[in-house]
From Swiss-Prot:
InterPro entries: NAD(P)-bd_dom_sf, PylD_N, Pyrrolys_PylD
Protein keywords: Amino-acid biosynthesis, NAD, Oxidoreductase
NCBIfam families cross-referenced by the UniProt entry: pyrrolys_PylD
Chain sites annotated for binding L-pyrrolysine: L8, V57, I64, A107
Pathway: Amino-acid biosynthesis; L-pyrrolysine biosynthesis
Keyword ATP-binding: no
Keyword Membrane among UniProt keywords: no
Designated name of the protein: Pyrrolysine synthase
Function, as annotated: Catalyzes the ultimate step of the pyrrolysine biosynthesis pathway by converting the isopeptide (3R)-3-methyl-D-ornithyl-N(6)-L-lysine to the 22nd proteinogenic amino acid. Is able to use surrogate substrates such as (3R)-D-ornithyl-N(6)-L-lysine in vitro.
EC number, as in UniProt: 1.4.1.-
Entry similarity comment: Belongs to the PylD family.
GO-annotated biological processes: amino acid biosynthetic process
Species the sequence originates in: Methanosarcina barkeri (strain Fusaro / DSM 804)
Matching Pfam families: PylD_N (PF21455)
Amino acid sequence: MAIKMALLTPDDLININMQLQKADSAVQEVTGLDIKGICKALYGTFSSSEKVGIVPVTSGNGIIGNFSASLHAITQYFGFDSFVTDMPDVSGYYEAVQNGAEIILMADDRTFLAHNLKNGKMANNQPCTGIIYAEIASRYLKADSKDVLVVGLGKVGFPGAEHLVQKDFRVYGYDADETLLERATSNLGIIPFDPANPKKFSIIFEATPCANTIPEAVLSENCVLSTPGIPCAISEELRDKYEVQLIAEPLGIGTASMLYSVL
């Protein structure tokens, strides 16, 4: 049976521009680069105001309120020339192509994709999100070692963990699903993390749809926590106590990763 994505709600996307600006500042403070700079470094690509057609999709649970408008705001923020089609689904796709879209953005319950019609490149949100959040974590300027804790090894976390392994980090991984943990251990050679014998980390990447997955025992002072997970992986109390550098935003960072990956 196909696994659905964790779905955003309209409340997650309120004030998306403000959320994105805040995240951009946080990323720059942690890495020395803004989100666009991270994307350029990660993919070696540059934006030239490509025209992006955003197509609403009604299948499954239907259109998420604010989703298309949020994608429009996000793509504009990163310098793309975007528009939302009047029609959804196949009619919307046709409309986008007829109106000169070079890149299509569209999502149903299982897949959020970017498709560059000029070069044929296609990107899925889940791996792109995992990779960019892992990349941000890996660039933490104040990291005290190459040890990284990855919590969540599913469709977002596994690609992020793989990216960190490829960058020669020593990756400790944990997932409540033992099958996912065993797969990551076997395929990536990561070190299984045992919550009963914790250690502290200055770099943490989290990718789960669960709240408060990061226990106090793994937090070091001023560590970075890079997480696309909703709800937030850490309590406000622990974040304040350890002055955690939190990188968390619902949609924009992953979308930027998708777009730059298909340029």
